[in-house]
Amino acid sequence: MSAVIGLDHGGKRIGVAVGDEETRQAFARPALLRRNVAADLDRIAELAAAEGTTRVVVGLPRNMDGSEGPQAAAARAFGAQLGTIGLEVDFVDERLSSWQAGEDLVAAGRRPERASGEKDSAAARLILQEWLDRRRPDDPKA
C-alpha cells in the first residue's frame, strides 16, 4: 500500500483523511483538535508513521479569483512546518471543499453545524481525492 495523508488546515481543527495511491481512494478520519504547533506536528508525525507514509497533501484555500490570501499563507506556513518533521508536502486548491463537504453531510442526513469535525475531515477527504484523481495516468492534468 502506498498511503497518503490529506489535511484540511483550520484554526480550531485539522481535518484528516488517508488514501491509497494504488486504489486511488481516500477516507475521512477523525479530525484533530488544534492544541499548539508542536503537539499538532507530533500527532501528524505519529499518524504518518502509523500509515507508513511521508507524503501529505494540504488543502490550499485560494480566493475565488485564484489569488492567495491570508488563509493560503497560513496553509503554506503549515506545510513548511510539516516539512521540518520530514514530511513531503503537496498542496491542492481547496476552493469550495468545505462547502461540498457540508453538502455531502446534508445528503447523508447529518447536520454540518453539529458535525464540524466530520465536516473538516470530509473536506480533507475531498482534497486528498482530488490529488489522487489528478495522479491517474490517463488524466491530462496529472
Residue ranges and their predicted role:
Residues 2-7, 11-142:
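Phosphate- and other anionic-substrate recognition elements at nucleic-acid/protein interfaces
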